[in-house]
Regions:
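Short alpha-helical segments and helix-capping/turn motifs at coil-helix boundaries
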Residues: 100, 112-113, 149-152
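Structured beta-strand/loop patches that form or line metal/cofactor-binding pockets in enzymes
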Residues: 1-44
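Metal- or metallocofactor-binding catalytic centers and their adjacent structured scaffolds
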Residues: 29-109
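N-terminal amphipathic alpha-helix/helix-capping segment at the start of soluble metabolic enzymes
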Residues: 1-6, 107, 111-125
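Metal-dependent enolase-superfamily TIM-barrel catalytic cores that perform enediolate-based chemistry
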Residues: 124, 129-185
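Short coil/turn motifs at beta-sheet boundaries
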Residues: 19-21, 92, 120
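Short Gly/Pro-enriched turn/cap motifs at secondary-structure boundaries
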Residues: 14-18, 89, 158
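Broad gene-expression machinery/nucleic-acid interaction feature
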Residues: 23-25, 96, 126, 163
């Protein structure tokens, strides 16, 4: 089995971009037609540039390789630069590519990926929701209003969630896209 192609998908998130401004997904396909999907995290650059980075890494380091050889691929990609210490964006790209390889391996062997990674640890997982403002609310005022937050938290409990996650400083995605200054927080 050999890796044959990569497709990338940049999915935007409507303003104010709560939960992230965009997501970058990739699809790797083998010569025998098995596809695996991965997500690239922690992109320091624009999403289309990061997707192009994934396509370049695939073309230079992974095309024609056996997806079962994750350690070999990982070490080669990790050691690409002269410093052999990649930046955080390349690590996000590598993570997405590795996830897609694990997906391919799981499909090829008929196993859930968790079995390949050591087995199931929990039979149930607690689900929580981030504390998002309602669609008709202004995000900046929502995060400053504890009563509005409590109302949404109660609604999530009614939906079956047993916990909510929130940032006491509010979501950074409601601010300008520059690095927030202390006064912004």
């Amino acid at each position: 089995m050999k890796l044959d192609s990569i497709d990338s998908f940049v999915v935007g998130n409507p303003n104010p971009g709560i939960g992230g401004r965009y997501f970058i997904f990739i699809k790797l396909t083998t010569q025998c037609g098995i596809s695996g999907y991965g997500e690239i995290y922690n992109a320091s650059f624009g999403p289309h540039l990061v997707a192009a980075m994934a396509e370049e890494v695939f073309a230079q380091e992974m095309a024609g390789e056996d997806p079962f050889q994750i350690e070999k691929i990982w070490r080669r990609v990790y050691s690409r630069g002269f410093s052999q210490r990649p930046d955080i964006t390349l690590m996000g790209v590598l993570s997405g590519l590795e996830i897609a390889c694990w997906d391919i391996i799981g499909k090829a062997t008929g196993q859930p990926v968790y079995n390949l990674l050591g087995g199931k640890l929990h039979h149930r997982l607690r689900s929580y929701s981030y504390l998002y403002p309602p669609e008709d609310a202004e995000a900046e005022t929502f995060y400053a209003d504890p009563d509005a937050s409590a109302e949404i938290a109660a609604r999530y409990i009614e939906e079956g969630f047993t916990a909510v996650k929130f940032d006491p400083a509010g979501a950074y995605t409601i601010l300008d896209p520059h690095m927030p200054a202390l006064e912004d927080i």
